[in-house]
Amino acid sequence: MRWYPIIGRLSDQDLTHRQLISRTRLLDRAFFKRPTLDVAPDLLGKIIVHKTDGQVVAGKIVETEAYLGNGDEAAHSARGRTQSTQVIFGPPGRAYVYLCYGMYECLNLIAEPDGQAGCVLIRALEPLAGIEQIEQRRPRAKRLRDLASGPGKLTLALGVTRARNGADVTRGELTVRELREPESFAIVQTTRIGISVSRDLPYRFYIKDNKFVSKP
């Protein structure tokens, strides 16, 4: 018998779609229409749900990074609005999916009021639903904790591609939900990783002692 993580406890099976919906509710646009540095830590503990090919997979956000529009050289929007970065300028509550190093697709969620640039990179998830499907998508993962412990890993796990770029995550097939009964946890704020500029900015957040983060 394999033990999988469930919201708030352990179980020998992962959440069904019905259980997931009954325990959570959709985030509205007002949640995202706030400063990026407020949205990034507040996304911890929220649930990303993706429905594709008749399958539902989901994971709890355990690690995020904030990227600002002004004065943040690591942000894609640092040089202004372009065809590839226009989604970052709003409206809030949409997905920004891009290809990194020509190999890995990364999922970001847009924050700030419409017209202002800001997004949150989702760095790691704790798998909650559709785990068998996730395992098929991540056959090289040797441990449950490695299924979605990184930006490129989690998009593979969720089945999210650049086809979801610009998707409204307050409705549709790719959504972000919150627990009806929120759990409590401590949050660690530290510097971002995997970038070459603006590395000293403390814009990375993760759930303390959560084993699914990419790097404590």
Question: Where would I find each of the regions flagged by the language model?
Answer:
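Conserved, well-structured core segments that form or line functional sites
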Residues: 8-216
